[in-house]
Amino acid sequence: MATDSGDPASTEDSEKPDGISFENRVPQVAATLTVEARLKEKNSTFSASGETVERKRFFRKSVEMTEDDKVAESSPKDERIKAAMNIPRVDKLPSNVLRGGQEVKYEQCSKSTSEISKDCFKEKNEKEMEEEAEMKAVATSPSGRFLKFDIELGRGAFKTVYKGLDTETWVEVAWCELQDRKLTKAEQQRFKEEAEMLKGLQHPNIVRFYDSWESILKGKKCIVLVTELMTSGTLKTYLKRFKVMKPKVLRSWCRQILKGLQFLHTRTPPIIHRDLKCDNIFITGPTGSVKIGDLGLATLMRTSFAKSVIGTPEFMAPEMYEEHYDESVDVYAFGMCMLEMATSEYPYSECQNAAQIYRKVTSGIKPASFNKVTDPEVKEIIEGCIRQNKSERLSIRDLLNHAFFAEDTGLRVELAEEDDCSNSSLALRLWVEDPKKLKGKHKDNEAIEFSFNLETDTPEEVAYEMVKSGFFHESDSKAVAKSIRDRVTPIKKTREKKPAGCLEERRDSQCKSMGNVFPQPQNTTLPLAPAQQTGAECEETEVDQHVRQQLLQRKPQQHCSSVTGDNLSEAGAASVIHSDTSSQPSVAYSSNQTMGSQMVSNIPQAEVNVPGQIYSSQQLVGHYQQVSGLQKHSKLTQPQILPLVQGQSTVLPVHVLGPTVVSQPQVSPLTVQKVPQIKPVSQPVGAEQQAALLKPDLVRSLNQDVATTKENVSSPDNPSGNGKQDRIKQRRASCPRPEKGTKFQLTVLQVSTSGDNMVECQLETHNNKMVTFKFDVDGDAPEDIADYMVEDNFVLESEKEKFVEELRAIVGQAQEILHVHFATERATGVDSITVDSNSSQTGSSEQVQINSTSTQTSNESAPQSSPVGRWRFCINQTIRNRETQSPPSLQHSMSAVPGRHPLPSPKNTSNKEISRDTLLTIENNPCHRALFTSKSEHKDVVDGKISECASVETKQPAILYQVEDNRQIMAPVTNSSSYSTTSVRAVPAECEGLTKQASIFIPVYPCHQTASQADALMSHPGESTQTSGNSLTTLAFDQKPQTLSVQQPAMDAEFISQEGETTVNTEASSPKTVIPTQTPGLEPTTLQPTTVLESDGERPPKLEFADNRIKTLDEKLRNLLYQEHSISSIYPESQKDTQSIDSPFSSSAEDTLSCPVTEVIAISHCGIKDSPVQSPNFQQTGSKLLSNVAASQPANISVFKRDLNVITSVPSELCLHEMSSDASLPGDPEAYPAAVSSGGAIHLQTGGGYFGLSFTCPSLKNPISKKSWTRKLKSWAYRLRQSTSFFKRSKVRQVETEEMRSAIAPDPIPLTRESTADTRALNRCKAMSGSFQRGRFQVITIPQQQSAKMTSFGIEHISVFSETNHSSEEAFIKTAKSQLVEIEPATQNPKTSFSYEKLQALQETCKENKGVPKQGDNFLSFSAACETDVSSVTPEKEFEETSATGSSMQSGSELLLKEREILTAGKQPSSDSEFSASLAGSGKSVAKTGPESNQCLPHHEEQAYAQTQSSLFYSPSSPMSSDDESEIEDEDLKVELQRLREKHIQEVVNLQTQQNKELQELYERLRSIKDSKTQSTEIPLPPASPRRPRSFKSKLRSRPQSLTHVDNGIVATGKSCLINELENPLCVESNAASCQQSPASKKGMFTDDLHKLVDDWTKEAVGNSLIKPSLNQLKQSQHKLETENWNKVSENTPSTMGYTSTWISSLSQIRGAVPTSLPQGLSLPSFPGPLSSYGMPHVCQYNAVAGAGYPVQWVGISGTTQQSVVIPAQSGGPFQPGMNMQAFPTSSVQNPATIPPGPK
């Protein structure tokens, strides 16, 4: 009927033309039935002829009127009405206007006007009256714009839809009334905001949303929505009507739906529909267009209805049920819509209820109708959309780019020849299918064959050539280009999926072209290549991208490696390999641990030898498979990768794996080949080239902020792009970087010129999210940042390449800016190290941060990763470490060191940064240059130059042996394998130059750090001379160990800081000596002595090797230089810690203070042996670290000694386990370049800080809270590291990050190494107590534990190296060795198992916010082992680390472990006392710590410890930093700290607020859990606060594992307490909190074996029957509550602090309760027996959570000793372990019995 058709037509039409009313349309279509009918109705009284004429007039008039006026529509009717019935026009108007064509219905009866009479008129009048009644506006909008008619269009569950009219445009609209929602104020506000946002959405495929308001209907409130009126129904009704949808229609409509979704997802912020289904997809009949509707309903329905009611189960993605979802839920729903369209069958129609659907959806079972899809292409697309794992789903962009949805251009492009996947050139054929669609004239049968080079050609260029050749008209060029692109893109994707075959040639060509240019900066260059290749890579399926992202997430370190692997396969072997190499050492570890297990079968040999190597081998294998030309690549890229492999295998070979190393590289034949080629040719040449090419860039990057440089971004920055944290203020440089064809926009907000080299950028993502992140120009690799961005879906995989390019450009610009800035700064500040460092700290928090960054590099102080942005690049830091593994990074770091010591330090931290620093140093110093070159050449030079170095140095033989072994391993060991190699070579060169003065120093350089140190010495001849006595010795010893790349990054950072502090350098050097010893061990797999520290999380063999190394090193070092050197070489982690400390120390006078703190810590640990001797040195450094470089250095050295001693006792096993579990994060960041430096395994360690935080705290997803929390953690961890060498290795990474974040970086660089170390120690303390470092604290959270460990090791090493303390240290080393041996047996196996489990668990728990803590636990174990001798250092470090990583359970557990180990290793309360003293020292002031430590800290330590605890507890906010370092720190440092504190306070506050909220909820949940736990476990301890029990429970499980790990090292030495602490990172925060978190962090990591070991150890060592059951019970309970408790615990624990996640809770607790946790550690150490690790954590588990005010009660630790270690921060009575303890009352009670008087 005319009316029927007319009605829809009118509505449809009204929708189409915007302001044209129904009437308006009618006149235009005067011939239509609708118009005629209407006219008939209106003109029934007129005669036929007259009617016609009248009609025309009226129509025209009405048209005009309608447009202008509401009256227009009624005009025809009005005329008619006037003639027929004198009905007032006003009355008619509404009806006409509203009713439009519906009048036709009423007028139908009058078929001819001639027949119509007055009677008809009357009838008509009556009908019209009825119509009017219907069409009268029954309601109007508050604004009066919209009218509602009483015409119901539809009714749903929650809404009724009426017809309405927009009086402004005369377009009919839909008036939707939603039933009463009973919305809360917050919900109402949210809906208002969403409505305002929806009003602005205008898109052809989105139903227009006009307005909304609240109204009262029938006495009830309702929400009214006015939307566009869709006339042809929904997709659902269409399917019901037509059953089968034609493929063409399906393609067209699906494409329109995708365009609409893309529009929504690209808004800022992104709009997620959440209820997409066929019922909400509307069709506009006339045009066949499709629009997505019901946008505002998802939120409204969500608010007031049960979750099961919200959304449509059939279309709801699995994550929707958990309410943790993103845009991918709409992709899932789209897939289900497409499935329904393809099958006309409702998805999951086989299920009877929503519960069945839920079970199927969450278990990944596809709907039954999925198998009914006939079109394979459609089926593939649907499958890609409805994958259970959201990260594997295709993205909207991928779908739109899919050939199936490509719009028909009338052209067809096909392959003329089969694609062999090997040739980059494709033979394509193009012909015209539909000439009508083209504007030009074409012959239908004419086909154009042409070649297309995937590498160089672009579709636009080819199309343009065709136009020029006359094949097509110019107007068709876009269509031609689109057709070519649509055909080439899938080919690229398939090749990316099969990189072995497809990309071989491409890679070869790239290797030749890019590899030659970038082999030197392989790190950086390759990342560039990957970025470029990302173009192709980005086109790979979303699934592939997501898999890669997941891998990256799992292992931040692996980030790079996994990316590199993918990139390699997708883009070019060279680029992939490069990124791999740069990140491989660290990646190798993390990757090997996380991915290694996956690829174990693939590379068993490599894995056995070195987890890192495994990965690299695998990668290499992949590369080889991918490219036969990989051999060429292997030369360029393999040097890096191989160095990784070599470094890893070499690390083992040094002691046991020498041959293994060789064979390891051979894991894959290509690898072996690469080794020889790369070694001699690629590395030497590439390294030199890198040095030459990278030096300028490196210098620039070191000196330039990551402003907006494009040039330098390419190679120097990429590898080290992760280093810096966002904390540093960045100079705003508006540098919008919309990438070509990318949907993201990158803008530079500011570049920091205060020495941290931080650049703050804002990224507008493809889905219109605004992501603000900061990164270190030198320390963060753009690839790493890109990986993280891709992983978080901020950047599409397809955009990654462009993103990296833009980042590189930014980095280059920033480097230029910084280069200029630092050139002047160096001129004024390098010489005046002290002054510069002060100003740096005070004036430029950024500089401090820079230092931190450099420290971070080696330490993987990716705690930055923890800043919620991740954008900060917590993850990036990990990645950066990976990248730093590559030689270019090393070179960069080296070169940068001389020129820009203040800045390089932080940069050094990141491997890349280190490389740049080194490069700078090389530029400035010939020796450095040589070093750098040798580093680049790594293998050749390592062999030749390392020997030289060894000969030059006193400990030449040992070093030579180690170095030679390390030569192979060294490059790999270093975060960048090339880097490490370069370092080694550089060391020899430097050795020659500085042999007399700093021969040791040069040896330090063999690793990255060694080179840095040498550079620093070179840069500061005077300083180096001062320290030459001790420094040289230390360096010599360090050099070999340093050869272990593990410490090179830290060393580089140190070198940078060393510029002003040779002493620090020496310190670093001595640990470095250990590193070479550990070089084999550096590799996560290799647990050589050198790697012992770094390997301690990696593998038990490492411990054994470490022991052997310790012995051999001891002998060699004694013969060569000092007995202490062997210890330091044994524990590269100590070196790393020292380095970490150095960087911060050199920051300023305060930095100097930091160094004393570190020394104090070391002294405390070594107090038994060297505490008297160190005391003066320590004091000196404390009082004037900068001025007394030489004096300070000895102190530092002695500290190192102690650390080494401690390491010796515990590291073998603890280190091994820690490394094993942490993927080498705990032990040697450099030793485990992949694990430590890279993000994966190290991710646990430093990833804890970066990735750890990121992953650990899913709740930290809030970028702000996460970032601030991470910063706080980082700050505290930093202080911890500074105060305790104990955490030296972790400290290096974290401290570097911390320093950079703390604005210590700038000054530390110029400062002497010692000064840097002091600063670092001070920073550590600050991080512990200073709120300024809170932000950093965040960043450093997990890494802190590592840092703390490294610091303790480093301190011990320093002590060992201290000339005055040689004998004492030697004895201590022996003790440590014995202890280590004791610990080693038990720890080794548990740790090894722990390492992988821990890594995996950590990865998982990181996501849960507790994985990191587990890592921390691992680290803690490691630290504990080291801390046996360095008890004072350990406690302080532990506290600080706990403080710093309060949130990071890692730190907590590590601290506990360390404390325990101190007790066991020290085997005397003095260890405890030392721990206390160290704590007090770090908490109060370096000076205080120094003296106490020097005094052996047995007597003073308790007091000092308590004081330190208090200061630490209070100092998490920053009081601690001021307390610890105020005395020694310069005013500049104070100012800087204050500035940093204030800088991040707001973020912290926000984060705390959010976290508090979450914690509150968790608290309640945990409370109930705790109550149940308390009931189940009866303990003498007072019940812990509710959240404590839960986290305690969840952590209990972790704790047993941690205990197991620690047990291995602590079982014999009664390090149960330490283990407890280690296991309870939260406990570290606040004793109770630390304890609680520890278990959580360890929970994921611990295996049943570990639990058994812990139980057995408890039986043997403690002899406490209760403990054993406790562990089992705890294990079980933790297992039960693991999933929920983990997050809950983490969240509960931080509830007081307001942190969102476990990490956060740990952090917050650490802030207030770090002292508590440390006291726990103290008490634990004091109790020789292994008190139940669980027990003690219970005690502190939540006591300190509330804040620093809670005294640590050791009830949990020792039921008898319910003493409250009075941590000033914990002003309260005893630690109330009740909350925590209740979780495991038995264990904790028993443990307390075991260790009644633990804390003092």
Swiss-Prot record:
InterPro entries: CCTL2_WNK, Kinase-like_dom_sf, Kinase_OSR1/WNK_CCT, Prot_kinase_dom, Ser/Thr_kinase_AS, WNK_Ser-Thr_kinase. The keyword Repeat does not apply. Activated in response to hyperosmotic stress: cell shrinkage promotes formation of a membraneless compartment that concentrates WNK3 with its substrates, OXSR1/OSR1 and STK39/SPAK. Activation requires autophosphorylation of Ser-308 and, to a lower extent, Ser-304. Autophosphorylation and subsequent activation is inhibited by increases in intracellular ionic strength: Cl(-) potently inhibits WNK3 kinase activity via direct binding. Also inhibited by K(+) ions. Kinase activity is inhibited by WNK4. Expressed in brain, lung, kidney, liver and pancreas, and in fetal tissues including placenta, fetal brain, lung and kidney. Very low levels of expression were also detected in fetal heart, thymus, liver and spleen. Isoform 1 is brain-specific. Isoform 3 is kidney-specific. The modification Phosphothreonine is found at T541. Its cofactor is Mg(2+). The modification Phosphoserine is found at S62, S304, S308, S1070, S1585, S1638. It is found in: Cytoplasm. ATP binds at T227, E228, L229, M230, K277. Autophosphorylated at Ser-304 and Ser-308, promoting its activity. Phosphorylation at Thr-541 prevents interaction with KLHL3 and subsequent ubiquitination and degradation by the BCR(KLHL3) complex. It catalyses: L-seryl-[protein] + ATP = O-phospho-L-seryl-[protein] + ADP + H(+); L-threonyl-[protein] + ATP = O-phospho-L-threonyl-[protein] + ADP + H(+). Changing T541A: Impaired interaction with KLHL3. Residues 707-723, 834-867, 880-894, 1442-1453, 1467-1476 have a biased composition (Polar residues). Its EC number is 2.7.11.1. Residues 147-405 form the Protein kinase domain. The active site is at D294. The keyword Ubl conjugation applies. Keywords: ATP-binding, Cytoplasm, Disease variant, Intellectual disability, Kinase, Nucleotide-binding, Phosphoprotein, Serine/threonine-protein kinase, Transferase, Ubl conjugation. Residues 1-25, 707-739, 834-868, 880-912, 1060-1086, 1431-1453, 1465-1496, 1571-1600 are annotated as: Disordered. Belongs to the protein kinase superfamily. Ser/Thr protein kinase family. WNK subfamily. Serine/threonine-protein kinase component of the WNK3-SPAK/OSR1 kinase cascade, which plays an important role in the regulation of electrolyte homeostasis and regulatory volume increase in response to hyperosmotic stress. WNK3 mediates regulatory volume increase in response to hyperosmotic stress by acting as a molecular crowding sensor, which senses cell shrinkage and mediates formation of a membraneless compartment by undergoing liquid-liquid phase separation. Interacts with WNK1 and WNK4. Disordered regions undergo liquid-liquid phase separation (LLPS) for the formation of a cytoplasmic membraneless compartment that concentrates WNK1 with its substrates, OXSR1/OSR1 and STK39/SPAK. This is Serine/threonine-protein kinase WNK3. It comes from Homo sapiens. The gene is WNK3.
